[in-house]
Structures are given as C-alpha cells and as structure tokens.
C-alpha cells in the first residue's frame, strides 16, 4: 500500500480546479435555490427556478445572477480541495490493512471529509447567502414601496419614496461581522452546516465509489471519464436531495436580513419547528431540484478532474489508480 500513498498537493490542486469550473457553470442556479428557500408563505416573489432567474435578469441584469460568486470562487478552491483530499486521506488510512473498504468504512471516510470541510464552508455560505438574497429583499421593498405610494395617492400628503438600500459587499459583511460578533459571526449556522455536509458526504462518497466501480473495465484500469462524470452526477444529486431539509434550515439561519413579516429563528430546532408549523412539510424541499441541478454537474466535473489527474500531469507525478 505504500506505493499508492496519495499526493496531497495534487489532490488539493485537482479539487481547486474542479471547484472553480463547477461554480462558474452552476452559480445562477444556486442563487435561485437560495432565494426560493428564503421566501416564506405570504411573501412569495418567485414561483420557480426559471421565474426567479428571469426576474433577477430583469431587475439586476445578467450579472445579477452571479451576486456572491466572487466569494465562492475565492473559497471554493480550499473547500472542494479539503473535501476531496480529506476523503482520499481517510480512505487511504482505513485501507492500510490491505483489505477492500467496507461500506461502513467508506461512510466513515465520508463523515471525516464532511466534518473537515465546514471549516471553510460555513463562512463561505454565510457571506454568499447575504449577497445572493440581497436582490430578493430589495425587490420586495420596492414592491411594498410602490403599493404604499398607490394607497397614498388619495391622501393630501404626498408619499416620499424610500431611498434604495445600498447592497453589501463581501468585504463589508466580513468586517461588520468580525467587529460586531467576532470570528463566531462568520460561523453562524455551523451546527446546521455540519448536519447538512456530514450526512451529504456519508451518502455521496460511498455511492460515488460504488457507481464508479461498476464502470471499471475488467482489465482493472481506471473507469472512463464519462463513467466518473455520471457517477458524480447521480451520487451528487441523490445526496443533495437527501439532505435538502437541513439545507433549508441552514439557509434560513444564516440569513441576517429578513423581509417584511418573515419569521426569525433562535436555533436549528426552533427554525425547523416554525417552518413545519407555518409552511408545512413541503417547505423542507424548497429548492431541492435547484440544489440537485447545482450539485450534480458540480461533483460530476469535480470527479472528472480528480480522476483524470490533471494536477499529477502538471506536477509530473505518477497517477494513483483510484
């Protein structure tokens, strides 16, 4: 097994390359997911993913769909690199006895990977959600302001339009959170992130490994790239839908700004209880298909880059058979 020890720098580079490509491709869908998950009953501005994206383009322009992308593009490299490299590391450590990994050990490796990645994922998601949801809140205020003007047209005193709230930047948000809440401000929703990412990794990595194994040639060579891509897509979408209820709760908890008449939450259980009481069980599946559409190609691309060993080629290292 010693000759198969993984090259950590190569895995980190592969994970980073995959993350950058994937985020660039699917970020608008992720924005739609965040806005759909954050809108509550009685305050619905969007009826579907396509409706959200169309309204976003109309009100904020094409690049409005990429609000918060800079945060993801900056932090997705360490985030994806940690996730993939940690899973590889734990799988290697758990297979040192020369035995084939059991399903339990594969799930254990995935659990370790999911736990490691939240170091980067939590602040990344915290900042991204504020930037993504700012457009929804601004549009809601604009609609309410227009309604107030219409209702006040018959009054003697003319209504004054409220000044537009400046939209925050990632730097401003980070500075404000650190000043007001310290480092803990960037890690709000850490528990919910763990409850989402650990089960996701427990489902994703073993499912991917077994699906990828089905496409491995009888000669023992690595699976073709299209098999790795499809295995990543299927495993990613299945895991994403499975943990979507936790993702809805996490999104609500990490949203610092609320719309008119929207609930506030004191913690994970309080948030889950209020969603169930006020919006019903179906609310936990808000944005599920968006999340599946985001995760499927994101992890499909990641696994293709990872299994092609682009970094190994760049660094002149031998490819380790997965």
UniProtKB/Swiss-Prot annotation:
State the compartments where it is located: Mitochondrion inner membrane
The species is Bos taurus
PANTHER family hit by this protein: MITOCHONDRIAL 2-OXODICARBOXYLATE CARRIER 1-RELATED (PTHR45678), MITOCHONDRIAL GLUTAMATE CARRIER 1 (PTHR45678:SF3)
Against InterPro entries, the record matches this protein to: Mit_carrier (IPR002067), Mito_Solute_Carrier (IPR051028), Mitochondrial_sb/sol_carrier (IPR018108), Mt_carrier_dom_sf (IPR023395)
* Listed GO biological process terms: aspartate transmembrane transport; L-glutamate transmembrane transport; malate-aspartate shuttle; regulation of insulin secretion
Does this entry carry the keyword Membrane? yes
This protein is called Mitochondrial glutamate carrier 1
Which GO-annotated molecular functions does the record name?
amino acid:proton symporter activity; L-aspartate transmembrane transporter activity; L-glutamate transmembrane transporter activity
